[in-house]
Design a protein with these regions (language model features):
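Conserved histidines in hydrophobic membrane contexts and catalytic metal-binding motifs
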Residues: 1-346
């Protein structure tokens, strides 16, 4: 996207606008309030500091190593806490083996939230790391074939394939901001971006301007191209979320969609959105990766996402508990360092 334009607005909200120099597309529009919360949330959470983030390889390695070390520290702390508790269990099963205040509260918060701290650090590591091969079910050769086949199907079409003149589409509305020549499995269409919406127009017709959407026959053809005629599968129209197709309240996946259940070793499910022209694929490897990352990191679990209030309660409880656990750990670390410095000076 570089270079880009950055505009500063002289208004009370101190808006800032980022826009691409190539096509004028808006990348980001912020105000002082959103930037303030970004510095309290996303920036420290993802280590989005400009001096580091502009070096992508270094940033990825830093986050991976930090998350890995965090996993080891959390696991070691939980293990040592359990050991100390077991040695002092004669004091009572529900009593801390420590008497000093900071040690006691660090122990209690570690018992309650230590496991979640480990899974949070581990899932953060998984966000930038591929699943190890021993956890994957699909062979590498099959993954490469699937990727290369999809690239050939969605490759660029010749201009002649777009029978409908784009100027005819432009004449239908004054709100059109951009037209993109697109295709889905060799079927041409125009992606029309308006003020706040995106529409797909069938470009195979030379006369009428009509929406482009996926049909059942197009989906059947796509499934046969992917799996051949020897693999059995069935298709239905999904109007409610299932165990594989769902999302959080603000990121709910669109409905209805066509669901294809494939009878293969990977228990593959395909979800086709006929209006937005998109396909989602989920198999055993995808389910494992989703659990290891979004499931553990943001509680992206259907039982909780279907109950937003419960999701908020659980998430805020874990975040507050994890923050307190980290705070007590930092205090104890600072106290230990000060003791070492004082001892060294003597």
């Amino acid at each position: 996207e570089m270079p880009i334009y950055k505009y500063y607005f002289d208004d009370p909200e101190q808006h800032q606008l980022y826009m691409t120099s190539r096509d004028g597309r808006v990348l980001q529009f912020t105000d002082k309030n959103s930037r303030f919360w970004a510095w309290l949330g996303a920036i420290p959470h993802w280590v989005y500091f400009t001096s580091l983030r502009q070096h992508q390889t270094a940033w990825i390695e830093f986050v991976k190593w930090a998350a890995g070390i965090g996993c080891i520290m959390c696991f070691a702390g939980l293990w040592l806490g359990i050991q100390d508790w077991w040695k002092q269990r004669k004091l009572g099963y529900f009593r801390s083996p420590y008497r000093k205040s900071w040690y006691k509260w660090h122990f209690i918060s570690g018992v309650c939230f230590g496991l979640f701290a480990i899974t949070f650090a581990f899932s953060g590591l998984m966000s930038l790391t591929d699943m190890p091969d021993w956890m994957k079910k699909a062979p590498k050769e099959k993954q490469k074939q699937m990727f290369s086949g999809r690239f050939r199907q969605d490759s660029m079409l010749p201009v002649e394939a777009y029978a409908l003149d784009y100027r005819t589409v432009l004449s239908t509305s004054d709100s059109i901001k951009r037209i993109t020549w697109s295709s889905w499995r060799r079927n041409p269409y125009y992606k029309i971006r308006m003020n706040n919406t995106v529409q797909n127009i069938d470009s195979s017709d030379t006369i009428s301007v009509r929406p482009f959407r996926l049909t059942e026959e197009m989906i059947r053809m796509d499934v046969r191209q992917q799996f051949g005629d020897s693999v059995r599968w069935k298709m239905d129209l999904l109007s409610e979320y299932d165990a594989d197709y769902y999302g959080k309240k603000k990121e709910r996946n669109p409905l209805p969609v066509y669901r294809v259940i494939v009878d293969d070793d990977m228990h593959t499910h395909l979800y086709y959105d006929p209006e937005n022209i998109s396909q989602r694929r989920i198999d055993d490897d995808g389910r494992t990766r989703r659990f290891l990352y979004s499931g553990l990191h943001s509680l992206n679990i259907k039982y909780l996402t279907d109950r937003p209030i419960l999701w908020n309660i659980v998430m805020f409880t874990l975040m507050i508990g994890g923050t307190f656990l980290s705070l007590t750990g930092v205090v104890l670390s600072v106290k230990w360092i000060l003791r070492k410095i004082k001892k060294f000076r003597k």
